[in-house]
Amino acid sequence: MRPVVRVIREDWADTALPLPGYETAGAAGADLRANLPPESRAEGLVLAPLGRVLVPTGLRIEIPDGFEVQIRPRSGLALKHGISLPNSPGTIDSDYRGPLGVILVNLGDEPFRVAHGDRIAQMVVAPVVQARFELADGLGATARGAGGFGSTGTA
C-alpha cells in the first residue's frame, strides 16, 4: 500500500501551482516547486554565487507515522547551474507540521534566479527505523576497523 502524505496550502500560496508530483512512473522523488509570496512572484529570488536562501513551497505536510520525507537536490539544477541543498538530504520528521521550505545554495559562478513555480527540489517518502542505543564496553572487530575517509581507496 502506498503511504498518503496529506498536504495543505498556506493562505497566501498560489493555488494554480500543482501539488508535489512524480514526473515519470518510475520516479522516486516528487518535484517541489517554488511558491513565492505574492510580492515576490514577479521578480523571483536571485541567488548570488555561494549564497543561500530559504525558498518557500507554500505547503505544509502530514507524513504518516513510520515514514520521513527527504528533500534532495534536482540533478539538472546541480549540473547546469551549481544549485544544490547544503543539508542534503534534508529530513522532515513525521511529527513536523510547519511550513515546508527548501534551502538552496548556489555553488556556481553566476547569479541564479528562482522563478515562481520553478521545480527546485525533490522529496522522497521513506520508511523510518528507530534504533535502540546501548552503551557497550567494546565493539566487535572488523577487517576495516577504524579506517574511514578514503581508507578503502579511491580506485
From Swiss-Prot:
**Single biological process term from Gene Ontology:** dUTP catabolic process
On whether Metal-binding is a keyword of this UniProt record, the answer is yes
Q: Which domain of life is it from?
A: Bacteria
Q: Which cofactor does it need?
A: Mg(2+)
* Reactions this protein catalyses: dUTP + H2O = dUMP + diphosphate + H(+)
Question: What one GO molecular function would you report for this record?
Answer: magnesium ion binding
Q: What is its EC number?
A: 3.6.1.23
Under the heading InterPro entries, the entry gives: dUTPase, dUTPase-like, dUTPase-like_sf, dUTPase_trimeric
**Quick one: which residues bind substrate?**
R74, S75, G76, N87, T91, I92, D93
What the entry lists under CDD domains is as follows: trimeric_dUTPase (cd07557)
- Which pathway features in its UniProt record? Pyrimidine metabolism; dUMP biosynthesis; dUMP from dCTP (dUTP route): step 2/2
Q: One Pfam family from the UniProt entry?
A: dUTPase
Keywords, ordered alphabetically: Hydrolase, Magnesium, Metal-binding, Nucleotide metabolism
Q: Which family does it belong to?
A: Belongs to the dUTPase family.
The free-text function statement in the UniProt record for this protein reads:
This enzyme is involved in nucleotide metabolism: it produces dUMP, the immediate precursor of thymidine nucleotides and it decreases the intracellular concentration of dUTP so that uracil cannot be incorporated into DNA.
Q: Provide the protein name.
A: Deoxyuridine 5'-triphosphate nucleotidohydrolase
Organism equals Cereibacter sphaeroides (strain ATCC 17023 / DSM 158 / JCM 6121 / CCUG 31486 / LMG 2827 / NBRC 12203 / NCIMB 8253 / ATH 2.4.1.) (Rhodobacter sphaeroides)
Q: What is the lineage of its organism?
A: Bacteria, Pseudomonadati, Pseudomonadota, Alphaproteobacteria, Rhodobacterales
